[in-house]
Amino acid sequence: MSYEVSCPSCGSAVIFAFDASIIRVCSSCRSLLVRDGARIENAGLVAELVSTPSLLLLGETGSYQGDSFQIVGRVQVEHPAGLWDEWRIAFSDGRLGWLAESLGRRHLLLDVDPGDLPAFSQCRPGERIRGRSAMMVIDVGVATVKTLEGELPQDLRPGETWNYADLAGPKGAFATIDFGDGEAARAMYLGRAATLEQLGLGHLGREAGFAKAAAKALQCPECRGALTLRLPDLSKRVACPYCGTLLAVEGSLQAIEAADKQNKLSFEPAFKLGAKARLDGVTWVVLGAMERSSGPSDYTRYSWREYLLHEPIRGFRWLVEDRGHWTVVDNAHAGDLEMGTKRRFGGQTFRHFVSSEARVDSLVGEFPWAVTRGEITQAADYIAPPLILSEESTATEFNLSLGRYIESADVAQAFGIAAPALPRKEGVHAAQPNPYQGRVGPLWLWFLALSAVLVVIFLFSATRSRTVFQTTVRLPPGAVSGSPQAVFISEPFQVTGSGNVRVKVYAPLDNSWLYLDGTLANTKAEAVGDFEMEAGFYRGADQDGAWSEGSGEAVAFLGGVPPGEYTLRLAPQWGVVGRSKRVLKDFQVEVRRGVPRASYLLIALVLIFLWPAWVTSRSSSFETARWSESDHAGS
């Protein structure tokens, strides 16, 4: 039930619209009115609201998961990372909640029983707390009330402070624990990230045309150079592009001071401040750029450049350049991170690549947090190309981001510039897709399939070969090696069909050898096929034991043999080695038509093996180059 009173300061009508409301800010004179039953106390004036790019308004109604709510109050809270708008909402069923806005992100949180929670000093960024689905601590600090508007169900005063811990849980869950000024939790708010559309407030963005505070022009107090603040309601640091001075911005530019006169720009940004880029179907504006590095000393540091992009509805993202390679980086929900030697996120497994201390060396443009030159964070990168998962932590914060590798040509197209204007690529990037990896598996499958086909063809051909002549050649008694008496000439035999002709000889050799000078002659034409064959088998023993080598078998292949009647002529020579007394008396001869040659099959297999082997080698070399830059080089 609403309750109307007159403002003790200006006399204007002030309405407490909700029974639970304790304080109300007079919209006319900004007096803070405290309600105690029917008595109204004037607690003094509160400061004017700091201009922010929020699209929300008091009295605006929306709905979440089917339940309607109304925005009844706002608290502007100073956090270490900047100013937050925290809107108090009242649901139609009597529940209360908060709609928190910071750096373009919104979280809807409901009041819940804090239950058994760890003490404030036990909440460490990057670690999970017991209970509450093992949510991860992502931010701890002290919050300060700057100013208020509307009505609130708790007695808050400007300047009031409290300890807090922000948590992230699975499936987008988010929570804030309020510890008051001590160690024990006094309140907890649980919910998740939400867009204007999910809150039933999508019309605000459309009606406002994504309105934001106009850019403001000012002068650098050091060099008097002209500066433009594109986000005057959010920016906390501005680095002069002319002299490098880092400026601290208080509120909405009521004061500017030189924060670091030594911030000399050590790199040439690839894009001008204010440049626009069309990425993923959205137009982003370059707000700032910084160079960061890691390494054991100033002489052995590894540097890269990060460009801060902004879009009024989607907030912020980074475009990172590292040795001519580019990644688009967005904030990721740390509550969905599965820890371990490897990381699991978004259904993907990420392998550890490198851990380091990342330091801010130089910067230009504006930033929505109090960045400083020399600022150091503990960083770790995990990769699943083309994705890279990055963790950065300090004593008070844990940030998770997900990057995606993009080609230089796509970056150039996004900014409408020529690709050669961008830094030239060097080496292999941690998240760069391996151009060969997707081809290795299919190529080996292709090799196995084709090999199987060739083997089947070979075996099928072998079963279709046939013997056209076979005999045992007996040497005449007393015949001398190489003499005309030892020459063998067969009876005529028919060779039909097509294909090659194989002549195969087997002799029972023992420390002896056999050489044959052969001729396959057509009896009705002058076509003659000449060939030579040699077999030898040797054995013995030495200090290493018994040994043997060679064989009593020899083969010769003849090609281009047309069908017809043929005779086989063999002129043998033979001999023994050492003290062998075995005398060669005979040998066997076989002539077959259409015998596939295993050597041809082997050559074919080697040739088709070369392509997948080369691609595999290139893929392996690419991965070797990638991991040579990691903490696991050589492992």
Model-derived segments and their meaning:
Residues 513-550:
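Surface-exposed beta-strand/loop patches in noncatalytic accessory domains
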Residues 1-497, 574-635:
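Mixed-charge, low-complexity intrinsically disordered regions
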Residues 506-508, 521, 571-573, 592:
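Solvent-exposed residues in well-ordered beta-strands and their adjoining turns
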Residues 508-514, 575-579:
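Extended, low-complexity, turn-rich repeat/linker tracts enriched in Gly/Pro/Ser/Thr and Asp/Glu
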Residues 3, 216, 305, 514-516, ...:
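Envelope-exposed proteins and targeting segments
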Residues 495-505, 559-575:
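Noncatalytic modules at the cell exterior or secretory-pathway interfaces
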Residues 488-494, 542-562:
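Beta-sandwich interaction modules
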